[in-house]
Regions:
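Hydrophobic or amphipathic alpha-helical targeting/insertion segments
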Residues: 1, 6, 11, 75-102, ...
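Pentatricopeptide repeat
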Residues: 15, 30, 34-35, 50, ...
């Protein structure tokens, strides 16, 4: 019908004209017509109009409530979506599987584990826990939220898991860094007579790359050929990535060269592979080839190339990348900024790094750590400690990395008083027994010739390793106590 063709903000005016004609005909309050109007306004991006129409519907049913919830979930306004969900239950309207599926998209986006758990409990209470599609959606939600325990629980309690549920479980393991477990599940799935799908192969290749298992990766590559998936772009990209992560760059390059429809992901995984193996020049060369093929870089491309520039110490390439980043409007993205600051520091351009840092509207702990680390590595201990003070004044909470870097700054300046102040801050955060933090504290006290304090700290460490002993010995040696 005419309303279904109004499906984007460009059609909002046309939709309002249709709405006026419906009001004139007196059908606006009809539940079916009203629900269609809600969906139309949602697709046109006008949640205010959708809400007004919904409030005028007589005897709203589960479909109209779900349409309203879906409207807010689609635009990431999950708080409002949950408010409608609560109102729906208060009015004794029972949600259906579609209601929950609409919600879960919002939980994916926000990675809202608590809200996802609430929805899961509600679906169980409403006897919807046997719906395979809904189970899979919940399993994927828990995977995205990093809750592997919930992923395993749903799978184990499913009577007859199909390939979709198996894929979700394998993906859950692979995405959360459990590559070995993911591959064990894949093998078990095969033993139970369930054929591998393209999604299974993708998850398996991700797992192989995570644990550098090129043998199982090659077996999956054979499966790709057997299933005729050699032209499937996501599969090809995953093969390039897997071989690169396993250090087989020649094979990765061969697979890449055979891809006829390469996209930005294809280039990114190969560039990343070379850079991770510290073949930075090859990574930059690939970036130039990518431009010649007319593929536009994205933030991942720049992250890889900035790392390559840092490895090379190439300010010329780095500044060229920076200019492109600005031209594409990516200069305010935190990960890009962190890498830019790191690149300029590693190239020895500390003033430029400071300028990039200062231009950001807000600085997170990672960015502060990058700056402080850069100062310490270049011997600017005083600037590192000043930055630490500014970081605290900005109410950014330091991490173990922050403390390790600032303690190194104190050691380089033999600034015992400042070291003791940092020690107090470490104790307040309960980090003094972490091996690296504790060992750096020992080193700071020993370097500043407070051997009594260094020895007392060494005794307090839960485990004394070669790192902590070396920290003390280095302090003694520095002050001529080599014996």
């Amino acid at each position: 019908n005419a309303m279904s063709s109004c499906n984007s903000p460009l059609h909002l005016l046309e939709g309002k004209v249709l709405h006026d004609s419906i009001i004139f005909s007196g059908c606006e309050t009809d539940v079916m017509v009203g629900t269609t109007l809600v969906t139309m306004y949602s697709r046109c991006g006008s949640l205010h109009d959708a809400s007004k129409v919904f409030d005028n519907i007589r005897n709203s049913n589960v479909v109209s409530w779900t349409a309203m919830i879906a409207a807010y979930a689609r635009y990431g306004q999950d708080t409002e979506a949950f408010q409608y969900f609560d109102r729906m239950k208060q009015e004794a309207v029972i949600p259906n599987r579609v209601t929950f599926l609409c919600f879960l998209e919002s939980c994916f986006r926000e990675r809202s584990l608590e809200k996802g758990k609430q929805l899961h409990s509600s679906s169980i209470a409403m006897k919807l826990d046997s719906d395979v599609n809904l189970l899979t959606a919940f399993l994927n939600m828990y995977d995205r939220c990093g809750s592997l325990e919930h992923v395993k629980h749903i799978f184990v309690t499913s009577p007859n898991p199909d390939v979709v549920l198996w894929n979700a479980l394998i993906s859950g393991y692979a995405d959360n860094g459990y590559g070995k477990e993911a591959l064990l599940c894949l093998e078990k799935m095969e033993k139970e007579g369930i054929s591998l799908s393209a999604v299974t192969i993708l998850c398996g290749l991700t797992a192989c790359g995570r644990i550098n298992d090129e043998v199982k990766g090659q077996r999956l590559h054979s499966e790709v050929i057997m299933q005729g998936l050699e032209k499937d772009l996501p599969i090809c990209n995953s093969l390039v990535d897997m071989y690169a992560k396993c250090g087989w760059l020649d094979t990765s390059q061969v697979v890449f060269d055979k891809i006829s429809n390469r996209d930005v992901v294809s280039w990114n995984v190969l560039i990343s592979g070379y850079v991770e193996q510290e073949l930075a020049k090859e990574g930059i060369s690939l970036f130039e080839e990518m431009k010649q093929e007319g593929i536009s870089p994205d933030n991942v491309t720049f992250l890889c190339c900035l790392k390559a520039c840092a490895l090379l110490g190439s300010t010329e390439n780095g500044q060229e990348m920076h200019s492109k980043i600005i031209s594409m409007g990516l200069e305010t993205q935190h990960l890009i900024c962190n890498t830019l600051v790191d690149m300029y520091i590693k190239c020895g351009l500390l003033q430029v790094a400071e300028q990039v840092f200062d231009q950001l509207p807000s600085q997170d702990v990672v960015l502060w750590n990058v700056l402080i680390t850069g100062y310490v590595e270049h011997g600017y201990g005083e600037e590192a400690l000043q930055s630490f003070g500014m970081m605290q004044a900005s109410m950014v909470s330091p991490t173990s990395i922050t403390f390790v870097c600032t303690l190194k700054a104190c050691s380089s300046m033999e600034a015992l008083m400042q070291g003791r102040e940092i020690h107090m801050a470490i104790v307040k955060k309960g980090l003094e027994k972490e091996l690296l933090v504790g060992s750096t504290l020992v080193h700071m006290y020993a370097t500043c010739a407070d051997f009594e304090g260094a020895q007392a700290l060494l005794v307090m460490l839960p485990s004394r390793t070669v790192i902590s002993w070396n920290a003390l010995i280095a302090g003694y040696a520095k002050h001529g106590h080599g014996d």
